Each structure stands twice: as structure tokens, then as C-alpha cells.
From Swiss-Prot:
HAMAP family, per the entry: AcpS
GO molecular function, one term: magnesium ion binding
Gene3D superfamilies xref list: 4'-phosphopantetheinyl transferase domain
Keyword Transferase: yes
Main location (coarse class): cytoplasm
Reaction(s) catalysed (UniProt annotation): apo-[ACP] + CoA = holo-[ACP] + adenosine 3',5'-bisphosphate + H(+)
SUPFAM superfamilies in UniProt: 4'-phosphopantetheinyl transferase
Enzyme class: transferase
UniProt name for this protein: Holo-[acyl-carrier-protein] synthase
InterPro entries, per the entry: 4-PPantetheinyl_Trfase_dom, 4-PPantetheinyl_Trfase_dom_sf, ACPS, Ppantetheine-prot_Trfase_dom
E.C. no: 2.7.8.7
Protein's job: Transfers the 4'-phosphopantetheine moiety from coenzyme A to a Ser of acyl-carrier-protein.
The protein's required cofactors: Mg(2+)
Length: 122
């Protein structure tokens, strides 16, 4: 498999905490799928998980070379957890339009930051 693009993102967890405190469900429903919200809200402190998924979506959009809005919307990029780490689900038309077969994603967070790196493969 050939690497097409790489995307990375980092965000302060406090920014996500403030945004959710200010905009609540309106923000959550605009950015995160139901499954993503359910996963994060099961955590004692869901904010780091939301921040990680936000960074993941940004990294994927960068790896696609499109950003958010032109080819993919926030909720078109679904980040979910499997036994070996995060996986990405995109609408089928995105794979064909961009010319990729898979996106690999890594997410990490500490007390202050969440970061993600995505690799789009041909």
C-alpha cells in the first residue's frame, strides 16, 4: 500500500471542554456521531475522549487533503475503537473520489492535549 497523504492535529482539551460547556448538545450533535457520543459519554470524564476524536477527525480530513466541508463533513468521519486502537469509517464515495483504500489513525491524549495522526493509503 502506498501512502497518499498524512495528516496530524493537536488540540487543547480545555478548548473542547469550554466549547461543550458553552454549546452543549448542539455542538456534540454537529460534530460527533451517535456512536461516538455514546462511547465518550460512558467515560468518567468524557472530554478527553471527545478531544481525541475531534483531533482524529481533523487529522483524517488533512490526510484526505480536503479539510472539513468540501468532500467530508464532521459526521462523515466516524472514529470508533476496536481491540487494537481507533478505526475510521468514511462514506464509500470518499474512498473512490480521493483514490484511497484505507485510513490508519492513531490518537493519544494527556492531561492537557489530545493529538492524532492519520495516514491515507492507496
Amino acid at each position: 500500500m502506498e501512502i497518499i497523504h498524512i495528516g496530524t492535529d493537536i488540540i487543547e482539551i480545555s478548548r473542547i471542554r469550554e466549547a461543550i460547556a458553552t454549546h452543549g448538545n448542539r455542538l456534540l450533535n454537529r460534530i460527533f456521531t451517535e456512536a461516538e457520543q455514546k462511547y465518550c459519554l460512558e467515560k468518567t470524564d468524557p472530554i478527553p475522549s471527545f478531544a481525541g476524536r475531534f483531533a482524529g477527525k481533523e487529522a483524517v480530513a488533512k490526510a484526505l487533503g480536503t479539510g472539513i466541508g468540501s468532500v467530508v463533513a464532521w459526521k462523515d468521519i466516524e472514529v470508533f475503537k476496536v481491540s487494537h486502537g481507533p478505526e475510521v469509517l468514511l462514506p464509500s464515495h470518499v474512498y473512490a473520489k480521493i483514490g484511497i483504500s484505507k485510513v490508519i489513525l492513531s490518537i493519544s491524549h494527556c492531561k492537557e492535549y489530545a493529538t492524532a495522526t492519520a495516514i491515507a493509503l492507496a
